[in-house]
């Protein structure tokens, strides 16, 4: 009996979501277009990083070669963005990576993904709100910070912030109120701030190229101190030239620059609020990443042309660079752009946060009252207010520098799961899920052969076991031209094995870096064997028949691109320190307590599995 109950629980955790086939039906308001999505993605991604991150990475890691660091980071982000784009075309519903995981790899993984997305958005909102407050305080002479230190100091070093940030709380309250008014209104404000930000960045790039000098990309160490006007012995000069810290410095800078592109995934949460989601979401993701890369590339190039990389101020590099060139008045233009960027960033974090909460509550995995929709504004008002309140409390009490890495680990985990979902789903047979049917036209749905549809109850508990026998021939040379249950099972097993192998490669590459450099036998053997097995398993997946489902957008070069995306994301996760992993473990313990205490028993999919599900025939009729 115990084994039977354990098996039943396992099936519950792996059940997959069957989504309503209706294309248009949504409780949310469909009012966003492609331009709105591009503005949302650019506003979320092109935030404080462009005004601060470029200086820190150029000075400490890459020098003028920071432009290559941003290029590598952009390519890594595009890999994840392409995977999000395909799922946006397949499943244009609210929920982003959470929903993508739910319809592909099962309920437990979906809950983990959604829970970490919520964490990322909350921390992103709180940290940028504090940055906005600090920037504004700096601009007016720091009276707010001085008042807080004198009258509101918190005596809990290492636990709470030195002073509470009331202004950050006010910012979050204003943005929360703006989001409760409606999607169209908040999107309009976002577009205005984003346009101002882009114009300021264009001004910075043009000014930098005009006032800059190519000599700053060709410096040697003996030219350093006179150029900076100081004799600081702590300044790192490297070897000079365009790539002063070598290619390893460029890669190290790319790992940091990757986080500058985090934010585009908020586009994928708008599936039920976009007029034409199958086309608008992929275009919005790719276009926003392209615009952000051009901005990061141009600003970092202008910055290192205007001023020697080793002289850059890591906190406020752009005002320092203009001052170095004798144009101190330009700092006001930089301040305007910085405040606009810091205004769109929390809006970009707060916009998807309640929508992920709403999607999880609608599915019964979080408390049901969080799924309430305001009748007038058609927004998830309870989820918006709740998430805003949590973000405000964190911004008020905590120094968030220790939580930034925690935000990154949650985002990278979501990216990895989405890439894995694309890899798995591309090789699965047709199922009655919206995963396939939402991407089709009504005429195409009329032609679906009902005999090819498997039952909804079977599909909920995972991919079905195969009737064929495993053999080298059936694995490497499948008979069918279309995906079957057997080929789908092979891909599932291969994807799981591939994840283990990639994790092994990343652990050895990061933790065994010195052993690899010294040629230690065990490190070389494990690394070589794991890489070869990764190539073999990827080849096995490539040999399986691929789904011919027509979509408005598909990731090219599958399975190679999703595998590369998973590798990059896991490698960056392994770069995070031990404290981050401990905090991540605590966050996950809270997640498991909620899921096993509430979610697994109140899941809507559990109700369907218990007998309330519609028959495959009725699901098909609904699509016609």
UniProtKB/Swiss-Prot annotation:
Chief location: membrane
Residue numbers carrying Phosphoserine: 618
Reaction(s) this enzyme catalyzes, per UniProt: L-arginine(in) = L-arginine(out); L-lysine(in) = L-lysine(out); L-ornithine(in) = L-ornithine(out); L-homoarginine(in) = L-homoarginine(out)
Record has Cell membrane as a keyword: yes
Gene Ontology terms: cellular component: apical plasma membrane; basal plasma membrane; basolateral plasma membrane; plasma membrane; protein-containing complex
Function: High-affinity, low capacity permease involved in the transport of the cationic amino acids (arginine, lysine and ornithine) in non-hepatic tissues.
Protein name: High affinity cationic amino acid transporter 1
Organism field: Rattus norvegicus
Source species taxonomy: Eukaryota, Metazoa, Chordata, Craniata, Vertebrata
Gene name of the encoded protein: Slc7a1
């Amino acid at each position: 009996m115990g084994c039977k109950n354990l098996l039943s629980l396992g099936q519950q955790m792996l059940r997959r979501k069957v989504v309503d086939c209706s294309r248009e039906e949504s409780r949310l308001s469909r009012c966003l277009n492609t331009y709105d999505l591009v503005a949302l993605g650019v506003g979320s991604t092109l935030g404080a990083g462009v005004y601060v991150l470029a200086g820190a990475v150029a000075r400490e890691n890459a020098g003028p070669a920071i432009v290559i660091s941003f290029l590598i980071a952009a390519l890594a982000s595009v890999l994840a963005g392409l995977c999000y784009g395909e799922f946006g075309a397949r499943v244009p519903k609210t929920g982003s990576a959470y929903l993508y995981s739910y319809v592909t790899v099962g309920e437990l993984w979906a809950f983990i993904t959604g829970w970490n997305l919520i964490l990322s958005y909350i921390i992103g909102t709180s940290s940028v709100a504090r940055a906005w407050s600090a920037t504004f305080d700096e601009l007016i002479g720091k009276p707010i910070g001085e008042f807080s230190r004198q009258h509101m100091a918190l005596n809990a070093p290492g636990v709470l912030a030195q002073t509470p940030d009331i202004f950050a709380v006010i910012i979050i309250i204003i943005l929360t109120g703006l989001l409760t008014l409606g999607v169209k209104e908040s999107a309009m404000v976002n577009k205005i701030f984003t346009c101002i930000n882009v114009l300021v960045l264009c001004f910075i790039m043009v000014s930098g190229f005009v006032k800059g000098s190519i000599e700053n990309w060709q410096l040697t160490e003996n030219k350093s101190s006179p150029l900076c006007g100081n004799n600081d012995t702590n300044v790192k000069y490297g070897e000079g030239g365009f790539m002063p810290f070598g290619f390893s410095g460029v890669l190290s800078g790319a790992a940091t620059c990757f986080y500058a592109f985090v934010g585009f995934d908020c586009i994928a949460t708008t599936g039920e609020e976009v007029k034409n989601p199958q086309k608008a979401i992929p275009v919005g993701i790719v276009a926003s990443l392209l615009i952000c890369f051009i901005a990061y590339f141009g600003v970092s190039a202008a910055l290192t042309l205007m001023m020697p990389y080793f002289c850059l101020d890591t906190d406020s590099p752009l005002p320092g660079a203009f001052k170095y060139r004798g144009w101190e008045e330009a700092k006001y233009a930089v301040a305007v752009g910085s405040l606009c960027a810091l205004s769109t960033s929390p809006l970009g974090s707060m916009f998807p946060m309640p929508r992920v909460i709403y999607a999880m509550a609608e599915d019964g995995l979080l408390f049901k009252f969080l799924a309430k929709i305001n009748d007038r504004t058609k927004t998830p008002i309870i989820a918006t207010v709740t998430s805003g309140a949590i973000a405000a409390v964190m911004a008020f009490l905590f120094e968030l520098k220790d939580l930034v890495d925690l935000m990154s680990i949650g985002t990278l985990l979501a990216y990895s799961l989405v890439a894995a979902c694309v890899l798995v789903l591309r090789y699965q047979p047709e199922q009655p899920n919206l995963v396939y049917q939402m991407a089709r036209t009504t005429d195409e749905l009329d032609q679906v052969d009902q005999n090819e549809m498997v039952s909804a109850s079977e599909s909920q508990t995972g991919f079905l076991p195969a009737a064929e026998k495993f053999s080298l021939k059936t694995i490497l040379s499948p008979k069918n031209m279309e995906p079957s249950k057997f080929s789908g099972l092979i891909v599932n097993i291969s994807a799981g094995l591939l994840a283990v192998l990639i994790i092994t490669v990343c652990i050895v590459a990061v933790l065994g870096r010195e052993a690899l450099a010294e040629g230690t036998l065990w490190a070389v053997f494990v690394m070589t064997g794991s890489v070869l097995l990764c190539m073999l398993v990827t080849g096995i997946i490539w040999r399986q028949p691929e789904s011919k489902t027509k979509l408005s957008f598909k990731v090219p070069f599958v399975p190679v691109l999703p595998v590369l995306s998973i590798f990059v994301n896991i490698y960056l996760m392994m770069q995070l320190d031990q404290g981050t992993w401990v905090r991540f473990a605590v966050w996950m313990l809270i997640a498991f307590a909620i899921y096993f205490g509430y979610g697994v028993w109140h899941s809507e999919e559990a109700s369907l599995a218990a007998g309330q599900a519609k028959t495959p025939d009725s699901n098909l009729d609904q699509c016609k």
